């Protein structure tokens, strides 16, 4: 049967309890909104936050749908290249991209497609910079933390961003952590320390209704409630990572070993990456 539009109360309470236990961070069930996965979480969050003409900063390389989600919400997308070769955030370049129109920056760590995990020092520097820019412009700037790969780390610490920066919105999906891609279940979490957290949560609820994301699948809500603290065994992913990275670099390809997720971001050996990909497809590589 249907749950409430924002999700079953008991399910949200279990998720809030898990956040508090795992990360040592206070979470209120009444600021958690169940969604049809991370894509819905991002779409709803962006539509709740964005006014036409607002700017969204996206570190590059990035999951291509971010641009679609942001522009569909009426935002202007501003991309900032990550630092090479480690693909950590370039804090100075990000600071230069912030304007009085900046509403949010999307942070995806572990990252799709690079596999980079943004370090605690990186997140602390980002937080300090955004606090400074908020004070300079007298505006609220949010971090939208897209976290479907949070549990897929090969030993690198994955900072829990709300502990570093109050104006954070968590967009979480269980599809990767529970190996349930396609089951479409996740949540939005707004910390109580975020600016106008209750109004923002009301906007999230309203955006969910307007976009047709009313009541995430009930069966999957009850399923994840029994798995809130389940962590994946990443040993198979790590074995594949080591095998592919070793073989490809032995062949002369350039790549950085990913610290998380399950992607290997390989530099094209030709100037035209699309042309190289077409050749690779031809030979079934």
What do these predicted ranges mean?
Residues 1, 6, 10-13, 17-285:
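PLP-dependent class I/II
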């Amino acid at each position: 049967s249907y749950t409430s539009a924002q999700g079953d109360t008991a399910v949200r309470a279990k998720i809030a309890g898990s956040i508090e236990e795992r990360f040592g961070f206070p979470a209120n069930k009444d600021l958690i909104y169940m969604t049809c996965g991370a894509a819905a979480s991002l779409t709803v969050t962006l539509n709740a936050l964005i006014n036409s003409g607002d700017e969204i900063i996206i570190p590059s390389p990035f999951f291509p749908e971010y641009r679609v989600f942001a522009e569909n919400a009426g935002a202007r997308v501003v991309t900032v290249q990550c630092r090479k070769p480690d693909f950590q955030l370039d804090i100075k370049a990000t600071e230069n991209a912030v304007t009085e129109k900046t509403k949010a920056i999307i942070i995806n760590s572990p990252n799709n497609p690079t596999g980079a995990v943004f370090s605690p020092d990186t997140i602390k520097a980002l937080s300090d910079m955004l606090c400074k820019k908020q004070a300079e412009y007298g505006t609220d700037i949010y971090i939208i933390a897209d976290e479907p790969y949070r549990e897929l780390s090969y030993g690198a610490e994955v900072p829990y961003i709300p502990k570093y920066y109050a104006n954070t919105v968590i967009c979480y999906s269980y599809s990767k952590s529970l190996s349930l891609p396609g089951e479409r279940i996740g949540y939005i979490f707004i910390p109580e320390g975020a600016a106008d957290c209750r109004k923002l949560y009301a906007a999230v609820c309203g955006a969910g209704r307007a976009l047709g994301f009313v009541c995430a699948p009930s069966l999957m809500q009850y399923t994840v409630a029994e798995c809130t603290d389940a962590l994946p065994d990443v040993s198979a992913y790590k074995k594949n990572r080591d095998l592919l990275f070793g073989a490809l670099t032995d062949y002369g390809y350039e790549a950085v070993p990913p610290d998380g997720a399950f992607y290997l971001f390989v530099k094209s050996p030709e100037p035209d990456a699309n042309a190289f990909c077409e050749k690779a497809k031809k030979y079934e590589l």
